Amino acid sequence: GESLYSRRGVAESLRAFFPATLELTLAAILLAAILGTTLGVLSALYKDRIPDHLSRTVVLFFVSFPQFWLAMIFQLIFGLALGWFPISKRLDILMIPPESITGLYTVDSLLRLDFGAFKASVTHLFLPALVLSFGALASITRITRANMLEALDKDFVKMERAVGLPERLVIGKYVLRTAFIATLTVISLEFGWLMAGAVLVETIFDWPGLGLYIVESSLRMDFQPIMGITILY
Protein backbone atom coordinates (compact mmCIF):
# COMPACT_ATOMS: atom_id res chain seq x y z
CA GLY A 1 0.00 0.00 0.00
CA GLU A 2 0.83 3.68 0.23
CA SER A 3 1.53 5.85 3.26
CA LEU A 4 -1.29 8.29 4.03
CA TYR A 5 1.25 10.81 5.35
CA SER A 6 4.10 10.78 2.84
CA ARG A 7 2.27 9.28 -0.17
CA ARG A 8 5.24 6.96 -0.51
CA GLY A 9 4.94 3.26 -1.15
CA VAL A 10 5.26 1.19 2.02
CA ALA A 11 7.53 -1.37 0.34
CA GLU A 12 9.84 1.43 -0.80
CA SER A 13 9.94 2.88 2.73
CA LEU A 14 10.70 -0.52 4.24
CA ARG A 15 13.61 -0.98 1.83
CA ALA A 16 14.91 2.47 2.78
CA PHE A 17 14.67 2.03 6.57
CA PHE A 18 15.59 -1.66 6.88
CA PRO A 19 19.40 -1.30 6.41
CA ALA A 20 19.64 1.04 9.43
CA THR A 21 17.88 -1.48 11.67
CA LEU A 22 19.95 -4.34 10.25
CA GLU A 23 23.22 -2.47 10.87
CA LEU A 24 22.19 -1.62 14.44
CA THR A 25 21.15 -5.22 15.17
CA LEU A 26 24.32 -6.70 13.68
CA ALA A 27 26.48 -4.37 15.77
CA ALA A 28 24.44 -5.15 18.89
CA ILE A 29 24.65 -8.93 18.47
CA LEU A 30 28.40 -8.65 17.81
CA LEU A 31 28.91 -6.69 21.03
CA ALA A 32 26.65 -9.08 22.95
CA ALA A 33 28.55 -12.09 21.61
CA ILE A 34 31.95 -10.63 22.52
CA LEU A 35 30.93 -9.42 25.98
CA GLY A 36 28.73 -12.42 26.79
CA THR A 37 31.28 -15.01 25.70
CA THR A 38 34.08 -13.26 27.61
CA LEU A 39 32.04 -12.97 30.81
CA GLY A 40 30.79 -16.56 30.47
CA VAL A 41 34.31 -17.93 30.05
CA LEU A 42 35.60 -15.94 33.02
CA SER A 43 32.68 -17.10 35.17
CA ALA A 44 33.35 -20.73 34.31
CA LEU A 45 37.12 -20.55 34.82
CA TYR A 46 36.70 -18.81 38.18
CA LYS A 47 33.58 -20.63 39.33
CA ASP A 48 32.26 -19.44 42.71
CA ARG A 49 35.08 -16.92 43.02
CA ILE A 50 35.18 -13.14 42.72
CA PRO A 51 35.28 -12.93 38.87
CA ASP A 52 32.31 -15.31 38.68
CA HIS A 53 30.21 -13.34 41.16
CA LEU A 54 31.27 -10.02 39.64
CA SER A 55 30.42 -10.96 36.05
CA ARG A 56 27.01 -12.33 37.01
CA THR A 57 26.30 -9.20 39.06
CA VAL A 58 27.25 -6.92 36.16
CA VAL A 59 25.06 -8.85 33.73
CA LEU A 60 22.14 -8.86 36.16
CA PHE A 61 22.55 -5.11 36.73
CA PHE A 62 22.33 -4.16 33.07
CA VAL A 63 19.57 -6.63 32.22
CA SER A 64 17.40 -5.53 35.15
CA PHE A 65 17.04 -1.93 33.98
CA PRO A 66 14.73 -0.95 31.09
CA GLN A 67 16.53 -0.27 27.84
CA PHE A 68 15.00 3.18 27.44
CA TRP A 69 16.34 4.20 30.87
CA LEU A 70 19.82 2.88 30.10
CA ALA A 71 19.72 4.65 26.74
CA MET A 72 18.96 8.01 28.34
CA ILE A 73 21.59 7.51 31.07
CA PHE A 74 24.23 6.60 28.48
CA GLN A 75 23.27 9.65 26.42
CA LEU A 76 23.66 11.90 29.46
CA ILE A 77 26.98 10.40 30.60
CA PHE A 78 28.85 9.42 27.44
CA GLY A 79 27.21 11.87 25.06
CA LEU A 80 26.50 15.12 26.88
CA ALA A 81 28.74 15.02 29.98
CA LEU A 82 31.87 13.38 28.54
CA GLY A 83 31.28 14.11 24.86
CA TRP A 84 32.71 10.78 23.77
CA PHE A 85 29.90 9.70 21.44
CA PRO A 86 27.08 11.35 19.46
CA ILE A 87 23.60 10.76 20.85
CA SER A 88 21.45 10.66 17.70
CA LYS A 89 21.31 9.85 13.98
CA ARG A 90 23.62 7.68 11.90
CA LEU A 91 26.00 10.47 10.84
CA ASP A 92 26.72 14.10 11.64
CA ILE A 93 24.07 16.44 10.23
CA LEU A 94 26.48 18.18 7.83
CA MET A 95 28.14 14.95 6.65
CA ILE A 96 27.11 13.44 3.32
CA PRO A 97 26.29 9.70 3.63
CA PRO A 98 28.51 7.33 1.64
CA GLU A 99 27.17 6.20 -1.71
CA SER A 100 24.77 3.36 -1.00
CA ILE A 101 25.87 -0.14 -1.92
CA THR A 102 24.53 -2.24 0.94
CA GLY A 103 22.74 0.50 2.90
CA LEU A 104 25.01 -0.17 5.89
CA TYR A 105 27.03 3.01 6.42
CA THR A 106 29.97 1.25 8.05
CA VAL A 107 30.30 -1.20 5.16
CA ASP A 108 29.62 1.33 2.40
CA SER A 109 32.16 3.82 3.77
CA LEU A 110 34.83 1.09 3.88
CA LEU A 111 34.01 -0.04 0.35
CA ARG A 112 34.34 3.57 -0.82
CA LEU A 113 37.51 4.06 1.28
CA ASP A 114 35.81 6.98 3.02
CA PHE A 115 37.44 6.63 6.43
CA GLY A 116 35.97 9.86 7.76
CA ALA A 117 32.46 8.57 7.16
CA PHE A 118 33.46 5.20 8.61
CA LYS A 119 34.70 6.76 11.84
CA ALA A 120 31.57 8.91 12.13
CA SER A 121 29.24 5.98 11.45
CA VAL A 122 30.99 3.79 14.05
CA THR A 123 30.86 6.48 16.74
CA HIS A 124 27.17 7.11 16.05
CA LEU A 125 26.48 3.37 16.05
CA PHE A 126 28.30 2.43 19.24
CA LEU A 127 25.98 3.75 21.97
CA PRO A 128 22.65 2.47 20.56
CA ALA A 129 24.26 -0.87 19.69
CA LEU A 130 25.70 -1.19 23.20
CA VAL A 131 22.35 -0.47 24.85
CA LEU A 132 20.55 -2.89 22.54
CA SER A 133 23.15 -5.61 23.17
CA PHE A 134 22.23 -5.80 26.86
CA GLY A 135 19.01 -7.56 25.86
CA ALA A 136 21.00 -10.61 24.71
CA LEU A 137 23.93 -10.37 27.10
CA ALA A 138 22.45 -12.41 29.94
CA SER A 139 21.41 -15.37 27.78
CA ILE A 140 24.77 -15.57 26.02
CA THR A 141 26.70 -15.28 29.29
CA ARG A 142 24.64 -17.96 31.05
CA ILE A 143 24.76 -20.48 28.21
CA THR A 144 28.52 -19.93 27.71
CA ARG A 145 29.19 -20.41 31.42
CA ALA A 146 27.05 -23.55 31.63
CA ASN A 147 28.62 -25.16 28.57
CA MET A 148 32.13 -24.20 29.63
CA LEU A 149 31.60 -25.87 33.02
CA GLU A 150 30.23 -28.96 31.29
CA ALA A 151 33.15 -29.09 28.85
CA LEU A 152 35.72 -28.59 31.62
CA ASP A 153 34.42 -31.73 33.30
CA LYS A 154 34.82 -33.91 30.21
CA ASP A 155 37.30 -36.77 30.22
CA PHE A 156 39.23 -35.51 27.19
CA VAL A 157 39.97 -32.22 29.00
CA LYS A 158 41.28 -34.09 32.03
CA MET A 159 43.45 -36.22 29.74
CA GLU A 160 44.88 -33.17 27.94
CA ARG A 161 45.76 -31.60 31.27
CA ALA A 162 47.28 -34.87 32.47
CA VAL A 163 49.63 -35.11 29.48
CA GLY A 164 50.88 -31.60 30.21
CA LEU A 165 49.29 -29.43 27.53
CA PRO A 166 49.37 -25.70 28.39
CA GLU A 167 46.19 -24.52 30.10
CA ARG A 168 45.72 -21.74 27.54
CA LEU A 169 45.79 -24.29 24.71
CA VAL A 170 43.34 -26.59 26.49
CA ILE A 171 40.87 -23.77 27.15
CA GLY A 172 41.20 -21.92 23.86
CA LYS A 173 41.43 -24.80 21.40
CA TYR A 174 39.34 -27.55 22.97
CA VAL A 175 37.06 -26.36 25.77
CA LEU A 176 35.88 -23.10 24.21
CA ARG A 177 35.39 -24.69 20.80
CA THR A 178 33.17 -27.37 22.34
CA ALA A 179 31.20 -24.91 24.47
CA PHE A 180 30.70 -22.36 21.69
CA ILE A 181 28.43 -24.62 19.61
CA ALA A 182 25.45 -24.06 21.91
CA THR A 183 26.39 -20.40 22.36
CA LEU A 184 26.27 -19.88 18.60
CA THR A 185 22.72 -21.26 18.53
CA VAL A 186 21.64 -18.82 21.24
CA ILE A 187 23.30 -15.93 19.39
CA SER A 188 21.35 -16.71 16.22
CA LEU A 189 18.08 -16.83 18.17
CA GLU A 190 18.84 -13.58 20.00
CA PHE A 191 19.48 -11.81 16.70
CA GLY A 192 15.79 -11.99 15.80
CA TRP A 193 14.74 -10.78 19.25
CA LEU A 194 17.11 -7.83 19.08
CA MET A 195 15.83 -6.78 15.67
CA ALA A 196 12.24 -6.89 16.89
CA GLY A 197 13.15 -5.13 20.13
CA ALA A 198 15.02 -2.21 18.58
CA VAL A 199 11.97 0.08 18.60
CA LEU A 200 12.69 1.89 21.87
CA VAL A 201 16.42 2.20 21.24
CA GLU A 202 15.88 3.59 17.75
CA THR A 203 13.31 6.07 19.04
CA ILE A 204 15.51 7.42 21.84
CA PHE A 205 18.62 7.68 19.66
CA ASP A 206 16.61 9.01 16.70
CA TRP A 207 18.00 6.15 14.64
CA PRO A 208 16.26 6.16 11.22
CA GLY A 209 15.29 2.50 11.09
CA LEU A 210 12.11 0.45 11.11
CA GLY A 211 11.59 0.97 14.85
CA LEU A 212 11.50 4.76 14.59
CA TYR A 213 9.42 4.47 11.41
CA ILE A 214 6.69 2.44 13.12
CA VAL A 215 6.61 4.81 16.11
CA GLU A 216 6.23 7.86 13.87
CA SER A 217 3.59 6.05 11.79
CA SER A 218 1.66 5.15 14.95
CA LEU A 219 1.69 8.76 16.16
CA ARG A 220 0.34 9.88 12.78
CA MET A 221 -2.25 7.09 12.68
CA ASP A 222 -0.69 5.99 9.39
CA PHE A 223 -2.03 2.45 9.21
CA GLN A 224 -0.43 1.17 6.00
CA PRO A 225 3.19 1.35 7.26
CA ILE A 226 2.11 -0.13 10.61
CA MET A 227 0.61 -3.15 8.85
CA GLY A 228 3.65 -3.48 6.59
CA ILE A 229 6.14 -3.51 9.46
CA THR A 230 3.94 -5.88 11.48
CA ILE A 231 3.90 -8.35 8.60
CA LEU A 232 7.68 -8.00 8.17
CA TYR A 233 8.34 -8.74 11.85
What are these regions (language model features)?
Residues 70:
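Rossmann-like NAD(P)(H) cofactor-binding subdomain of soluble oxidoreductases
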Residues 18-51, 67, 80, 97-233:
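Alpha-helical transmembrane segments of integral membrane proteins
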Residues 75-78:
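Transmembrane alpha-helix termini and helix-breaking/packing motifs in multi-pass membrane transporters
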Residues 84-102:
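Juxtamembrane non-transmembrane "cap" segments at the membrane-aqueous interface
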Residues 9, 73, 90, 139, ...:
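Residue-level recognition of oxygen-bearing side chains
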Residues 5-6, 56, 87, 172, ...:
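Phosphate-coordinating loops and pocket residues in cytosolic domains that bind phosphorylated ligands
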